[in-house]
Amino acid sequence: MTYFVLFLGLCFVLGGLAVASNPSPYYGVVGLVLASVAGCGWLLSLGVSFVSLVLFMVYLGGMLVVFVYSVSLAADPFPEAWGDWGVVGYGVGFVVVLVVGLVVGGFVGSLDFGVVTVDSVGMFSVRLDFSGVAMFYSCGVGMFLVAGWGLLLTLFVVLELVRGLSRGAIRAV
């Protein structure tokens, strides 16, 4: 179980690296899906199934819509893949920064691996993450509205950035 959680953590970091290394949007969406699946699987293996499901729906429902619009509007004749020198340079730079941060922070020698689940203290009649479901929908209404408007604003910003000088449907004939 510990190795599985470490594998999911590694997949999460590699997925984030695949998005952050600035490939073409065609390839960046694959890194986003890998990171979201690995992160939600990581939470699921630790016993937080409801929060994992909510985050998975937010990631795939919100951010993938933005990436789909970016891919549809950014028609590159020669898209940058992960094997191009610029993307590989970004990836190597991120890995070097991560390793230097781990060494300087002193985390390399003191890595104790262990897995602790959410309800490992004893037997509960209701799991701990399901007790927060009511809080999501009662006190979290404002947060959901702000997050929805934020995703809509992000969609419009990405559409405006990708559109360029073509002026969309409002063009002078």
UniProtKB/Swiss-Prot annotation:
Main location: mitochondrion
Gene Ontology molecular function, alphabetical: NADH dehydrogenase (ubiquinone) activity
Gene3D superfamilies xrefs: NADH-ubiquinone/plastoquinone oxidoreductase chain 6, subunit NuoJ (1.20.120.1200)
InterPro entries for this protein: ComplexI_Subunit6, NADH_UbQ/plastoQ_OxRdtase_su6, Nuo/plastoQ_OxRdtase_6_NuoJ
Cellular component annotations (GO), alphabetically ordered: mitochondrial membrane
Transmembrane segments: 1-21, 27-47, 48-68, 87-107, 139-159
Location of the protein in the cell: Mitochondrion membrane
Enzyme Commission code(s) on record: 7.1.1.2
Keyword entries, A-Z: Electron transport, Membrane, Mitochondrion, NAD, Respiratory chain, Translocase, Transmembrane, Transmembrane helix, Transport, Ubiquinone
UniProt function note: Core subunit of the mitochondrial membrane respiratory chain NADH dehydrogenase (Complex I) that is believed to belong to the minimal assembly required for catalysis. Complex I functions in the transfer of electrons from NADH to the respiratory chain. The immediate electron acceptor for the enzyme is believed to be ubiquinone.
Protein name in the entry: NADH-ubiquinone oxidoreductase chain 6
